Amino acid sequence: MVDISLKILSNEMKISIKELIKTLSEISISKTENDCISITEKKNLLKYLESKKKPFLNTFILQRKTRSTLNVFTPGGKNKSVQIEIRKKRMYLKNNKSELEPLLKNKNLLQNKEKNNLKSLKNTISKAKESQKNIDILEESKANINFKNLNKLTKSNVFNKNEKNKSLKKNINFNNHSFYSKKTIKNNTENQKLYKEEKKDYHLTTFIHNRNTEDNRDREIEKNKRNFHRNIKNYRQKKNNKQNNQIKSKKDEVRISKNRKNVKQKNKSILLQQVFKKPESVINRDVVINGAITVCDLANKMAIKSSEVIKNMMNMGIIGTINHVLDQDTAQLIAEEMGHKVILRRENELEELIMKDRDTGNNISLTRAPVVTIMGHVDHGKTSLLDYIRSTKVASSEAGGITQNIGAYHVTTDFGSVTFLDTPGHSAFTGMRSRGVKITDIVVLVVAADDGVKPQTIEAIQHAKEANVPIIVAINKIDKVDSNIDQIKNDLTKYNILSEEWGGENIFVLISAKTGKGIDNLLNAILLQSEILELKAISTGMAEGVVIESFLDKGRGPIATVLVQKGNLKKGDIILCGFEYGRIKVLRNENGKTLKHAGPSMPVEVLGLSKVPFSGEKVTVVRDEKKAKEVASYRKNKSREIKLANQNRSSLENMFKNIKKNDFSELKIIIKSDVQGSLEAISSALFKLSTNEVKVNIIGSGIGGITETDASLALASNAIILGFNVRADASAKKIIDLENLDLRYYSVIYDLLNEVKAAMTGLLSPQYKQNIIGLAEVRNIFKSPKFGLIAGCMVTEGIIKRNNPIRILRNNVVVYEGELESLRRFKEDINEIRNGMECGIGIKNYHDLNIGDVIEVFEVKEIKRIL
């Protein structure tokens, strides 16, 4: 065979000459670039390269990556996700002859660490001398291991002591080599001892079995992982695929490895799945409907989109949006149509529960004092009568001598206790008076002997009859000379008020509030009537009552005058009053005296409410303040919903109102009053003043003084501020003076109404009337270079004035309306001409005059209008 040059060999092997020379030097062959290589050297080179590429023929390497996400809390309170990747590499080896032959031939590697191995052998020999038994066992085990390994390597059966030491040295060197680990040799020696005792094969069968099972498990995990990623890749771009949901749910699985320290065990993977999964079928829910509900809220209760509900509504013939309010029955139909179970609840269920959970006492009714309402016309002496009974001077403190709000007084007389309600007499307080009738037992109708039956007297009779309340007629001012009692009795018979003397059921009492005459007879009549009515009430347990009056005190807060109807009202009780609630802090009577409790038919002032309640609201004592707050909030929201529903209700009438809404003027007013009753009365009276042309718009109202907020509102909306028994504070006065706002104070309601009426009159659109002042007949027509056509006319009626508008009549039909351009008699310009005279008339921008036309001259006058 011919030798081959290194250059040709390098080209065949596709490596550089320098790398080839370096590789030859590693197998103890020194060559240069120009040298040749023999066949044997080439074979050795190829064997070496093959052994270098595959140092172990039976080597199995596994690589594995595990990815997971770790949530880390940051100082800002947010979660930060950290991606973690764990990489594992495992190598499996099998000992055989072909693996160890190149190692034994490599002399350079064995000689480098020969000295260290000799030292270790000396140490082992010295230890073996100490105990002979241990030496024998150690020598036997070492000999067996070495012999068996050497049998496989060299296929020789006999080794001497030097060869045994060499094999030990080579094995130790092999341990230090990168291909074998100390751990592997140690396990091999231990397993060989076990197999020697059991006389089995030297292969580590159990160890291999464990490894194989673990490898199979790893292969299954890797296979599942590859399939999972393959499925994700296949379905990633399919947007509307049904399997996307399953893949997404798989993505949500988090793989976590639990690592145990110092435990030689395979890491176990745990799969944590997300709790929520999209339902595959429709879920039927229990939908609770309390009352009226919007489409959006109904959709939220059914856990579906609002568009689905609207689609179902359209299929049922109902058109609406997400803000459309559905009543309870309609919402029930829609929910049941969509397959849900509906649970209906009453709107006032919470209120009913809180009312049931009340201590009503022993249910023993006792006789109570009668509640008497004094009613009648203005200035007929109602307050003076009550004054005399109470022996106080209340009337002098009333503005203008007229009662402005309901006064409740508990009077103890020699004949018994009576509670009086003094309602205002004039028509503005109709609402207050009607509330007074609802809580009263007896009505005392005061009629002035010198004035007779008046409109408010008739109204009082109507209120009393509607409430089925007995009426006692008190004819006042009998001390006056011009009194006519029989005429009053006759007038009252028209309204079915008959005295007992005339065979009727009504008691008539003649009194004089000034002198006190007949007052005792009136009290006797009241108590007699109360005995007939058998007035009784429960005086124990939680109290109930009615708000007679309410106002805001600057130092004490909201104050309500409450008439107790049954039960015992005590300090510290939790009360529910309309939209308001609170705990009673102070109880006072009409004289300002502090009370600890109040029984039936007792009027008291209550402090401690959240806000000022409306007059006429029912007061109820409850147990739980939290529940009382919930009920008050529910009532407020319900009232707001009703108002919004009424505003949104479209009708033909509202449509026409919207069309004509710009055809009227508007008077904007801000009202501040001292008490709630007066505020309501003024508001209702002002609304009654509204007409089709002028509307009263109360943009703000309240109880208490005029504040800076009120002044700012008046400035922004160009409104008038009306103060009834209140004044403006310093900050409000500053804005009012600076902006020149209209602020007016009143103490009598009549003055307020009259001035508002005058202001509304000024807002009325003016009316105009046309008066015909003269007629002229066209007798001839002339042409003028300056004015065009000139009509020669004869004044047949009235006066023709130059500056007034005119109409041209032809056959009694108006053909033109305009104005005069010139008026002359002969050649002189004149301003007017009287009946029976001739004149020349030039008409502006009109040239179609005919002989026989009539020129009508008129004037426009403005007519003053009143409400």
From Swiss-Prot:
Residues 476-479 are annotated as: G4. The keyword NADP does not apply. Signal peptide: none annotated. CDD domains: IF2_eIF5B (cd01887), IF2_mtIF2_II (cd03702), mtIF2_IVc (cd03692). This is Translation initiation factor IF-2. It comes from Buchnera aphidicola subsp. Schizaphis graminum (strain Sg). It is found in: Cytoplasm. GTP binds at residues 376-383, 422-426, 476-479. GO terms for molecular function: GTP binding; GTPase activity; guanosine tetraphosphate binding; translation initiation factor activity. Belongs to the TRAFAC class translation factor GTPase superfamily. Classic translation factor GTPase family. IF-2 subfamily. Residues 367-534 form the tr-type G domain. Pfam families: EF-G_D2 (PF22042), GTP_EFTU (PF00009), GTP_EFTU_D2 (PF03144), IF-2 (PF11987), IF2_assoc (PF08364), IF2_N (PF04760).
